[in-house]
Amino acid sequence: MFRASLPGVALYQAEYDLYLDFTYQYGIGAWRTSRMRTRLLAGQFAPACQALLDYRFMTSARKEGPGWEPYQWDAAGRPKRWRYDCSTPGNKVCRGVWTRQQARHAACMEAQ
C-alpha cells in the first residue's frame, strides 16, 4: 500500500525507511494527504524532507492545559479540537514527537 502510493518515485533505502516509519506512526491516510508525498511525486526530494517538520502537533478533543490552542471549530464557532505544538522549547507534553521528527528530517537530509 505504501509503495503503491509513490508510483515512479525512486528513493534511497534510507528515505524509504523513514517515510515508511512515518506512515507506521501517523497512518496511511496522513501519508496520502501529506506534503511529503506530494513533493516526492513532483521529484522535490529536499522539500519533502522539510515537510517532515510539519508533523509536530499533538491533538485532543479538549484543552489539556496551558499551551493548547484550538484548531477546529463546530458550527456554532466553539472549539472542538485542540492541539499542542510539540516543538515548543522545554515542553514536557510531547517532546518525543518533535525529537522523532527532527531525527527523521536529519536522516532524510543526509540521504540527499
Located regions from the model:
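An amphipathic, hydrophobic-aromatic interaction surface with interspersed Lys/Arg
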Residues: 1-42, 46-47
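Long, amphipathic alpha-helical surface segments
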Residues: 29-112
